[in-house]
């Protein structure tokens, strides 16, 4: 009986340690996801001086030949800053947890707008 109790206590301690480690890993995971989200936001909202585009949204400005067209393009885009679309977030959306949180927040917004 004493042997079983020792084994039980040993397993209980192992479980406690595993739960602590799980919490630490989840915190680190959340931190990494937030970092990816922030970097992605920075990249998607970047306003490069060349206005050539980026790998996610395309290179529409790449073939513009004259600097006059570039200046006009820059001026017209500067006042029409479009909000970021969550569908453009290919890295964040690849995370199951981010996609789940996004769906939940969209559901909450729809519920609030219906009230």
From Swiss-Prot:
Which chain positions lie within coiled-coil regions?
A: 1-43
Classify the source by domain of life: Eukaryota
- Taking the first listed entry, what is the main subcellular location of this protein, grouped into a coarse class? nucleus
Q: Does the keyword Transcription regulation apply?
A: yes
GO cellular component terms listed in the entry, alphabetical order? histone acetyltransferase complex; nucleus
Task: Kindly indicate whether the keyword Disulfide bond belongs to this entry.
Answer: no
The function of this protein is: Component of the NuA4 histone acetyltransferase complex which is involved in transcriptional activation of selected genes principally by acetylation of nucleosomal histone H4 and H2A. The NuA4 complex is also involved in DNA repair.
Q: What family is it from?
A: Belongs to the EAF6 family.
PANTHER family under this entry? CHROMATIN MODIFICATION-RELATED PROTEIN MEAF6 (PTHR13476)
Name of the protein described by the UniProt record: Chromatin modification-related protein EAF6
Q: Which organism is it from?
A: Kluyveromyces lactis (strain ATCC 8585 / CBS 2359 / DSM 70799 / NBRC 1267 / NRRL Y-1140 / WM37) (Yeast)
């Amino acid at each position: 009986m004493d042997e079983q109790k020792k084994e039980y206590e040993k397993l209980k301690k192992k479980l406690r340690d595993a739960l602590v480690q799980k919490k630490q890993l989840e915190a680190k995971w959340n931190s990494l996801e937030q970092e990816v989200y922030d970097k992605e936001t920075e990249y998607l909202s970047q306003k490069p001086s060349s206005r050539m585009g980026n790998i996610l949204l395309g290179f529409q400005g790449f073939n513009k030949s004259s600097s006059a067209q570039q200046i006009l393009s820059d001026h017209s885009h500067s006042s029409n800053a479009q909000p970021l679309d969550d569908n453009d977030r290919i890295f964040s959306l690849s995370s199951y947890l981010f996609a789940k949180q996004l769906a939940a927040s969209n559901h909450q917004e729809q519920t609030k707008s219906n009230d």
